[in-house]
């Protein structure tokens, strides 16, 4: 994981080589930084200095009760938690009121299918961290929201069907 984080390119979003731009605002950057207060930071990548709300990708070693393992960060921070087996990993993943998105990393396709069935998340990636595509549904579960944006189901969640009957006699 460390070599991938070190290689992650943070920079100008107009540059095609950039993999992540700055955060949206100073207040958002501050909120993401707040998740690192008292956290066991294992390692960080790099980010530009100067103008912009830059934030280096960060990996944190966490426990199940840690804030970073229980809340949505909305920033380039990965919380790594130890687990005993598949059932324990699923229990840990679901032990939060949130369920927007997650990732499963494994070489075992059967394990990926089993775990993905058990994790309560609106979007789930296998061996990837970026699974949002405009042609596929996107949305959360639990306190992360209801409904789906994008994809063929999107219109259903932004419209309300109404039947109007006209008598012609």
Identify what each model region corresponds to:
Residues 15-20:
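Short linear capping/connector segments at secondary-structure termini
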Residues 34-39:
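Helical element adjacent to the flavin cofactor pocket in flavoenzyme catalytic cores
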Residues 40-47:
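Short secondary-structure junctions
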